[in-house]
Design a protein with these regions (language model features):
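Bacterial N-terminal signal peptides
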Residues: 7-17
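Beta-strand-centric surfaces of beta-sandwich/beta-rich domains
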Residues: 24-215, 220-340
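Positively charged n-region of N-terminal signal peptides that target proteins for export
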Residues: 1-4
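A broad, structure-centric signal for solvent-exposed, well-ordered loop/edge residues
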Residues: 7-8, 281, 390, 411
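C-terminal region of N-terminal signal peptides and the immediate post-cleavage residues
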Residues: 15-24, 478
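Extracytoplasmic copper-binding redox domains, predominantly the cupredoxin/blue-copper superfamily
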Residues: 341-478
Length: 478
């Protein structure tokens, strides 16, 4: 009896101490970080590179999930038609590892994979926060990390992944391309496949040659409005296989025209065995039937486990290509625009003065013909057929970029994430008038532009792609 009682007492003691032991050896930690505060200047659309104390886990382990966001210092997530997270890229030891665009894709790796983390790693943050309004603001870049510390029992079975950055304009700090309305085939345009001479005389920039056998574990695409999907393709000798199509899911009532979107990522069972010498490539497909899409992107970061065995033979037919949405609809994306506003229809306005000198853009206003100015200042300036109308951006001295981009008349409705669009009956776009470091800026590195000289008689509406509340018009006469 005494022995039985002793055994029972020891059993009860072990049950009592078990929760404490589990708490001392956590499995997955959910950590929240923020970088900033960042002061956002009026109309800002510049790229910054910061290596100053980017927060990260303080102990070694594995990062298995990453969820980015943008929040105001005073609290709350800003609307996307007010402040737009164009991109944030977390570079670790010089390599792009985690990233965010305005679709705010959330990454979660299947077990037992993770990014190896050492507190001594060098973290640098490349970020571009786009202010669509002429106001100052202050924000934090936030990111929630799912983390397996080395003290966790899960750490013993973890397998290390690396991010392989596949980009249709790989190697560029601002990797963009233009999609012109009517380009491609059947209202769709795929870059670089349908771009004439996409890379000039240089090598293809959308490819990566596998240097070591291993397993692909996860991927998801990054697109801009108008984007439909990205494709990840493997080539082995003379054989090709589409490994995954990352589709864009739009909640936007107007269709594929806004940031009211989420991307499909690979499913939890997606694994692809790759061999040294395999070539992976990425392409991006956009809707080219409705509007033009300037400064578009197509990126697919891939989590790759080198030296790991397993995964499906890409040519076996056993690859699970079903995707999963990384998140649902976000409330900051619900101001769509397009409602009737108080701006005039420029087609009904009397002629403005003849344009003999460049029209100055200053303080977020176009010179003559700005619809927000009212009165005589809103009347479209007149230029004779065959003659250009010139613009100069006086705000460029304050690092504020503006465009003159054709939109469908009257182009006078309320601004939102889906309005206005670059859908004028005649296409023209100035690029972002302003200056910045070559290759590291959205700016065109000029502050002047002139309209095409082949425009027919009529009234032409335009807006600023950087600050879409800005609207203007001009008139061509014989």
């Amino acid at each position: 009896m005494r022995r039985a009682a002793l055994v029972l007492a020891l059993a009860l003691l072990s049950l009592a101490t078990a929760p404490g032991a589990a708490a001392a050896a956590p499995k997955v930690q959910h950590l929240s970080y923020r970088y900033g505060p960042l002061t956002i200047t009026p109309g800002q659309n510049t790229i910054s590179l910061d290596g100053d104390k980017v927060p990260r886990p303080k102990v070694p382990g594995y990062i298995v999930g990453f969820r980015p966001n943008l929040v105001r210092v005073k609290g709350g997530v800003p609307r996307v038609d007010v402040l737009h997270l164009h991109h944030a890229v977390w570079l670790i030891n010089g390599q792009p590892t985690f990233a965010a665009g305005e679709e705010k894709t959330q990454v979660s790796l299947p077990r037992p994979y993770g990014w190896r983390h050492d507190p001594a790693d060098a973290w640098v943050l490349n970020h571009m926060v786009h202010n669509l309004l002429p106001n100052r603001d202050r924000v934090y870049l936030t990111y929630d990390i799912d983390f397996v510390p080395d003290s966790s029992p899960l750490a013993r079975g973890m397998r290390t992944v690396q991010t392989r950055w596949l980009d249709v304009e790989g190697g560029s700090a601002y990797p963009v391309f233009d999609v012109h309305r009517g380009s491609g085939r059947g209202g769709r345009f795929t870059y670089p496949d349908q771009a004439p001479n996409a890379y000039g005389d240089g090598p293809a920039r959308n490819r990566w040659v596998v240097q070591r056998d291993g397993v692909l574990v996860q991927t998801a695409g990054h697109l801009h409005p108008g984007g439909l999907y990205t494709d990840l393709v493997l080539q082995r000798g003379g054989r090709r296989k589409n490994l995954f199509r990352s589709r864009a899911k739009y909640w936007e009532p107007a269709g594929a025209v806004s940031w009211d979107v989420a991307m499909y990522a690979t499913g939890r069972k997606w694994r692809v065995a790759v061999k040294k010498g395999d070539v992976l490539s990425v392409s991006a497909t956009y809707d080219s039937g409705r509007a033009s899409w300037y400064e578009s992107m197509g990126i697919m970061p891939v989590a790759f486990a080198p030296g790991v065995k397993g995964g499906a033979d890409p040519f076996s037919g056993k690859l699970d290509r079903r995707g999963r949405l990384t998140h649902g609809q976000l409330p900051e994306n619900r101001n769509h625009g397009g409602e009737r506003g108080g701006l005039p229809d420029p087609r009904a306005l009397p002629d403005g003065p003849g344009a003999s000198a460049p029209l100055a853009i200053s303080d977020f206003l176009y010179g003559q013909g700005d619809l927000l100015r009212g009165g005589a200042a809103s009347r479209p300036p007149v230029v004779r057929a065959g003659q250009p109308l010139s613009f100069v951006n006086r705000d460029a001295s304050r690092d504020i970029f503006h465009t003159i981009t054709a939109c469908r008349a009257p182009c006078n409705r309320q601004t939102g994430i889906a309005y206005p669009l670059a859908d004028g009956p005649v296409e023209f776009d100035s690029g972002e008038l302003g200056f910045g470091p070559a290759g590291f800026t959205a700016a065109a590195n000029r502050d002047t532009w002139a309209t095409p000289t082949n425009l027919k008689a009529g009234t032409y509406s335009y807006f600023c792609r950087v600050h879409p509340f800005m609207r203007g018009a001009f008139r061509v006469k014989q």
